[in-house]
Amino acid sequence: MDLKQFIRDIPDFPQKGIIFRDITPLLKDSRAFREAIDRMCDLVSDRDFDLVVAPEARGFILGAAMAYKLGKGFVPVRKPGKLPYRTVYEEYQLEYGTEQLHIHEDAIERGQKVLIVDDVLATGGTAEALIRLVKKLGGEVSALAFLVELSYLNPRKRLEGYDIKTLIVY
């Protein structure tokens, strides 16, 4: 199944000059969604990890489904003020400002191996902040898995030295 056909291009969103890769048609189609999760799990089947860490919002959808299928724990990473317990955070740059990612301070035990999952690898800024959060808590990043990679933004350069798995590449 060609999963790329389920990704909708939205020009000039969230701002002029950006083509947004909308995964909601893929999520709506049960066969495509199942295929995407199965194939993303296959991409990391040879990696050793204890937890799946994923940011809101679309990262939750993919990360939680993968954690369930692989029999791993799931750790949510959220925007400020959304987690009820004490958190640590990292700031990162967006094309249009600065954002923060928060994780519970006890979410990852020292030495635990982590798979980071998100929907789209664009500039690598979010992934870089997630890596810093995992390391801040004493975890080790085993690999990163993404449904979509925007290779024309050259995100792998920013994440050099990490094992990056992607299903759909633009």
From Swiss-Prot:
Instruction: State its Enzyme Commission number(s).
Output: 2.4.2.7
Gene3D superfamilies listed in its UniProt record:
3.40.50.2020
GO process annotations (BP)? adenine salvage; AMP salvage; purine ribonucleoside salvage
Function noted in UniProt: Catalyzes a salvage reaction resulting in the formation of AMP, that is energically less costly than de novo synthesis.
NCBIfam families the record matches:
apt, PRK02304.1-2, PRK02304.1-3, PRK02304.1-5
Q: How does it assemble?
A: Homodimer.
| The name this protein goes by in its record | Adenine phosphoribosyltransferase
